[in-house]
UniProtKB/Swiss-Prot annotation:
Protein name, per record: Small ribosomal subunit protein uS14m
Keyword Nucleotidyltransferase: no
SUPFAM superfamilies referenced in this protein's UniProt entry, alphabetically: Glucocorticoid receptor-like (DNA-binding domain)
A Pfam family per the record: Ribosomal_S14
Name of encoding gene: MRP2
Main location: mitochondrion
Amino acid sequence: MGNFRFPIKTKLPPGFINARILRDNFKRQQFKENEILVKSLKFIARNMNLPTKLRLEAQLKLNALPNYMRSTQIKNRCVDSGHARFVLSDFRLCRYQFRENALKGNLPGVKKGIW
């Protein structure tokens, strides 16, 4: 399923959705689809044993790729709220959602600290 905002059709993520989550999801999908192409072009561009012309062409192709195909564009976001700050990567939750879910007992192996 696609929408008007993105140049390529994308699937919608499950759960909470806002514009930032849609953008991040689109970038993740495009990075996943083009990862092999980008890695091969980087290998060619950085291989000193190859001819200079071939390396230069690979570098120009890399520079021509859109920004949304780069891994640096991907941001860790909370799957419950969409927050991008203080996301615990093991649970993919922001600190507030982590606290709420831990207190409810929704996270296995996590309990309130007592000392």
